[in-house]
Amino acid sequence: MDTHRPIRRALLSVSDKTGIVEFARALEAQGVDILSTGGTCKLLADNGIKVTEVSDHTGHPEIMDGRVKTLHPKIHGGILARRGQDESVMAENNISAIDIVVVNLYPFANTVAQENCSLEDAIENIDIGGPTMVRAAAKNHKDVTIVVNASDYDRVISEMQSNKGSTTYKTRFDLAIAAYEHTAQYDGMIANYFGKMVPDYTEEAAEDTKFPRTINMQFTKKQDMRYGENSHQDAAFYVENDIVEASVATATQLQGKALSFNNIADTDAALECVKEFDVPACVIVKHANPCGVSIGSNILEAYERAFKTDPTSAFGGIIAFNQELDAATAEAIVERQFVEVIIAPSVSDAAAKIVSAKQNVRLLVCGQWTDKAAGQDIKRVNGGILVQDRDLGMVTQGDLKVVSKRQPTEQELKDLLFCWKVAKFVKSNAIVYARDGMTIGVGAGQMSRVYSAKIAGIKAADENLEVKGSVMASDAFFPFRDGIDAAAAAGITAVIQPGGSMRDAEVIAAADEAGMAMVLTGMRHFRH
């Protein structure tokens, strides 16, 4: 059975007019009659393309300030007509077949993103006729081609040129899927917008909320994976549509094997941690926890110091930088250790050549970043999801409250703030020991905080790193003084923690007894 369908009549009505003139001209060259509306029609006519206004085709003018343009049986009958079945009905009602529909929708997302957007502005940017035509054409994809993305224009024209003005069923089916994805995303945006507000012209006594009644999100599959977190689990990686922040989702892979499920999770942890620093920094992650973090005068120094924290755990780890990967640093990495992933804002040609000697190493370029974008984190639980704001909180020196008898030194303050940034990305209960802008011990994921403190000390001792004179960060308050006592016994001289425990006085007294300085942040950084 022939599944090719010739295109003889097109309907073009787009908000984003990128490439539409060239596309229409190519259709015209194939002998296609073109229908259009409003601004699209004027643009095509101004560029010398023969076009028929939809209102002339239907015999009915646009009404209600353009709210009703294409909602007419001559349009939807022409789109939905089943070839070989509905011809008599079409003839009886003077309906002509429409073979291709090219539509993209009113820019609702851009409108509501504007600070001064009113409810009325939002309402007027809800497209009605567009989604209706898109869904109709997608439903009848057996006979009709639907195009919602300008990136598909060339594909359609190329196929028509290769198939005597026709498109194949495979292409129409693929474009229909894209159309349904497009309208689903569009309706989801509208539902999200209205779901978190109460119109100011109602008498309903309720407040706006940042969390809508339902959540509608759309992600696009980037890759299928060999398996998930474990080999018996199937997996795929989906990326958020329209994301602009530098991330593992937007990164470009220059070389190496395909990223695994765990690679992606660990790379995300490493990159988000290194973003906290505005001086050359390196973060090495293993199983989603930083095992070595350092700042330096350059990224080579930062890497060497980060590696020094825990060389054993760094084996097979993920390395993230906040500056360009240069040749000297690349050389140090490939000569010193086995690494799964290296990610940086950019990679020099010389560095890329050096890393290419290790073909299995996954080398990623994520681009430079400025500020982290506000947004929400989602955690899956059985039967639901937990939604919260991204943890973008961070303190500066001016936010700290000194509660100990001894004031921290200037160097201790620098190290405390460094240590606090690292602790934010360590699984709770998190304890981090650091000195001179370098971690010397990380205690992660323990059920009791005192054991995390002990593990941080053990890690430092195992690598012959001097704890005496170092500082400690805790992601949450100390419920008892035992964590402070363990740190003091190891040689810690200053502590940064949120405070807020019922036993804060006891904990502060323990610090004073040991001659330690203690500062409170008033901010917790649990990470589960």
UniProtKB/Swiss-Prot annotation:
Provide the E.C. number(s) assigned to this enzyme: 2.1.2.3, 3.5.4.10
Any one Gene Ontology cellular component term annotated for this protein: cytosol
Record-linked Pfam families? AICARFT_IMPCHas, MGS
The MGS-like domain, residue ranges: 1-148
Q: What does the record give as the reaction this protein catalyses?
A: (6R)-10-formyltetrahydrofolate + 5-amino-1-(5-phospho-beta-D-ribosyl)imidazole-4-carboxamide = 5-formamido-1-(5-phospho-D-ribosyl)imidazole-4-carboxamide + (6S)-5,6,7,8-tetrahydrofolate; IMP + H2O = 5-formamido-1-(5-phospho-D-ribosyl)imidazole-4-carboxamide
Q: In which pathway does it act?
A: Purine metabolism; IMP biosynthesis via de novo pathway; 5-formamido-1-(5-phospho-D-ribosyl)imidazole-4-carboxamide from 5-amino-1-(5-phospho-D-ribosyl)imidazole-4-carboxamide (10-formyl THF route): step 1/1; Purine metabolism; IMP biosynthesis via de novo pathway; IMP from 5-formamido-1-(5-phospho-D-ribosyl)imidazole-4-carboxamide: step 1/1
Is Transcription tagged as a keyword?
A: no
Q: Keywords in alphabetical order, please.
A: Hydrolase, Multifunctional enzyme, Purine biosynthesis, Transferase
What molecular function terms (GO) are annotated for this protein?
A: IMP cyclohydrolase activity; phosphoribosylaminoimidazolecarboxamide formyltransferase activity
Q: Which InterPro entries match?
A: AICAR_Tfase_dup_dom_sf (IPR024051), Cytidine_deaminase-like (IPR016193), MGS-like_dom (IPR011607), MGS-like_dom_sf (IPR036914), PurH-like (IPR002695)
Q: Name one GO biological process term.
A: 'de novo' IMP biosynthetic process
SMART domains referenced in this protein's UniProt entry, alphabetically: AICARFT_IMPCHas, MGS
Q: Which family does it belong to?
A: Belongs to the PurH family.
* Entry note about domains: The IMP cyclohydrolase activity resides in the N-terminal region.
Name of protein? Bifunctional purine biosynthesis protein PurH
What organism is recorded for this protein? Pseudoalteromonas translucida (strain TAC 125)
- Taxonomic lineage: Bacteria, Pseudomonadati, Pseudomonadota, Gammaproteobacteria, Alteromonadales
